[in-house]
Amino acid sequence: MKNIILLGPPGAGKGTQADLICDLCNVPKISTGDMLREAVASGSALGNEVSNILDSGALVSDEIIGSLIKERLTMPDCENGSLFDGGPRTTGQAQQLADMNIKFTHVIEIHVDDQDIVKRMSGRRVHPGSGRNYHIEYNPPENEGYDDISGEPLIQREDDKPETVLKRLGVYHDQTKPLTDFYTKQSEAGFLKFFRVDGSNTVSGVFESISKQL
């Protein structure tokens, strides 16, 4: 059984690699956001508690996140393991899971330099009407600044503006550095395998690096 955590900054290609890893290991992809939405939709006592917390604008506690993860891992599709995309997000959540005897086998961090992330994300352009995506360097439109099909102007989303990307990267580093330290210690103690891969490689190159370690 493989219970895998996948970490990486926004724009590192986690979603693509998560899908490839899930296919390779025959495990479901699990995200904290999905679990919170499913809990609220279920109408359970825990779901109602989560709904009230989210409505108030507060953060869901590490204990509740831990309970949701523990419950999710008992479902039949997790028989071969699971892949957590982007979570746990804090050392508090990681410690809570360890205290609940939830065992992870692999923690993977996709590393990409900040300047490369900014280049990747700030180069994105989108056609608002259709959602068609372009990149000024990697997938440019035929006519700069305009959608190939409609000829209408493309926009840059707020989330993709360099100053916004840098803020998000700052938050990621603040949260993740203590988390990677936590899992490095667990790896050194033999509880799991923690490794970093170079996310600046091609999609297939990154996946090859990951699959060799699994």
Where are these regions (language model features)?
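Glycine-rich phosphate-binding loop of ATP-dependent small-molecule kinases
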Residues: M1-L214
